[in-house]
């Protein structure tokens, strides 16, 4: 039903996915998000993803990161919950002798991605990392993996094991950045998991397409060919959502697709993709709540101000696929609009932190500022 809708019509449809803020809702019902990533070298990526999720409207935004990254990310914002549960091979608490450590550091990637290989890495993960991570995952609505993960063997193996655990828990998962590198090496990591979304840029998409024996030229600009390539990648991965970032964002699930042509920023700066990923997490979670009809037919009574408000029923019945695709489109729209505003102010000096200044304004401009999304009766 989304096919051939105009950008304006898609934005209008997206409004019904925006979760209202009701007085009877409790903390966490508007989204419990976790971003898993971040190491000593890369602390900005997980921050931007989790901060974006919070600014767009998630109630609780967590980061699970490597221990050295924890204090740094905590210093960026007191609003995020930081859990330094991950470890890399430089962690002094691993109790490995020098020869073991050197052997692990020189492991070929092929051996790392084998599910049941390397008893030493698996033992470290089972004893020191996974119990804490799993404990938090049991309280989460949607998971983002990959931002700032790096290429450390223990970190990469932990990422694989965490993705497996997310699938066992049947949680929605968004794969970005370094997790897409793993997908390009072993597509089976996420293939056929219906709650997966991958968010490749041009280069990441080409790597994944090549791994699936699909021809994808970096210089390709023909819209129909880009759509066909992305549909083929989605299908070969088991009909998961592929959010292909580019001049125009292309959002595909099997044969269904949406294209976002809203003007963004001409400045390409590190971190914008992480901002998008966080926004996707919040809006996809709301779209899942929409499917659960979390706020349908609810009545809000405010005796002190003498009014009664009734929430609108869903005006158009969307199925799960369309709701998730539309949520991705809405997230893309918010971030593109915010990026355009930031670029108009800062020009060439624009940074991702400037984009975050405009996320709320962009959201309000596109979807309104009504807290309840209600009507008087």
Swiss-Prot record:
Its main location: cytoplasm. GO terms for cellular component: cytoplasm. One of its GO terms (molecular function) is ATP binding. ATP binds at residues 245-249, 264-273. Its cofactor is Mg(2+). It catalyses: (6S)-NADHX + ATP = ADP + phosphate + NADH + H(+); (6S)-NADPHX + ATP = ADP + phosphate + NADPH + H(+). InterPro entries: Carbohydrate_kinase_pred_CS (IPR017953), CARKD (IPR000631), Ribokinase-like (IPR029056). One of its GO terms (biological process) is metabolite repair. Its EC number is 4.2.1.93. HAMAP family: NADHX_dehydratase. NCBIfam families: yjeF_cterm. Belongs to the NnrD/CARKD family. Catalyzes the dehydration of the S-form of NAD(P)HX at the expense of ATP, which is converted to ADP. Together with NAD(P)HX epimerase, which catalyzes the epimerization of the S- and R-forms, the enzyme allows the repair of both epimers of NAD(P)HX, a damaged form of NAD(P)H that is a result of enzymatic or heat-dependent hydration. This is ATP-dependent (S)-NAD(P)H-hydrate dehydratase. The lineage of its organism: Eukaryota, Fungi, Dikarya, Ascomycota, Saccharomycotina.
């Amino acid at each position: 039903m989304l096919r051939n809708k105009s950008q304006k019509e898609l934005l209008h449809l997206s409004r019904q996915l925006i979760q209202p803020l009701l007085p009877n809702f409790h903390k966490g019902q508007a989204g419990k998000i976790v971003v898993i990533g971040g190491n000593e070298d890369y602390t900005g990526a997980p921050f931007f993803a989790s901060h974006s999720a919070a600014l767009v409207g998630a109630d609780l935004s967590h980061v699970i990161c490597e221990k050295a990254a924890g204090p740094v990310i905590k210093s960026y914002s007191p609003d995020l919950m930081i859990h330094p549960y991950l470890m890399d091979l430089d962690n002094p608490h691993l109790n490995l002798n020098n020869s073991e450590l050197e052997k692990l550091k020189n492991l070929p990637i092929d051996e790392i991605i084998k599910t049941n290989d390397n008893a030493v890495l698996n033992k470290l993960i089972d004893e020191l990392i996974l119990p804490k991570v799993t404990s938090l995952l049991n309280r989460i609505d949607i998971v983002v993996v990959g931002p700032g993960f790096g290429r450390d063997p223990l970190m990469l193996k932990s990422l694989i094991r965490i993705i497996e655990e997310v699938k066992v828990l049947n949680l929605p998962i968004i794969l970005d950045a370094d997790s897409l590198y793993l997908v390009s090496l072993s597509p089976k990591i996420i293939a056929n998991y219906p709650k997966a979304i991958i968010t490749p840029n041009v280069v990441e998409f080409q790597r994944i397409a090549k791994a699936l024996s699909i021809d994808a030229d970096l210089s390709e600009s023909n819209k129909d060919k880009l759509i066909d390539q992305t549909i083929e990648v989605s299908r070969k991965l088991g009909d998961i959502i592929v959010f292909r970032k580019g001049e125009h964002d292309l959002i595909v699930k099997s044969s269904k697709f949406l294209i976002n042509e809203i003007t963004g920023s001409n400045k390409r700066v590190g971190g914008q993709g992480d901002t998008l990923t966080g926004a996707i997490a919040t809006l996809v979670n709301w779209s899942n709540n929409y499917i659960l009809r979390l706020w349908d037919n609810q009545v809000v009574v405010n005796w002190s101000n003498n009014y009664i408000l009734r929430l609108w029923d869903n005006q158009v019945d969307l199925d799960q696929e369309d709701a998730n695709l539309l949520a991705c489109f809405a997230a893309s729209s918010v971030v593109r609009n915010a990026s355009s505003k930031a670029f108009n102010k800062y020009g060439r000096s624009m940074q991702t932190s400037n984009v975050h200044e405009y996320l709320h304004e962009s959201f309000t401009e596109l979807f309104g500022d009504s807290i309840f999304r209600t009507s008087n009766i």
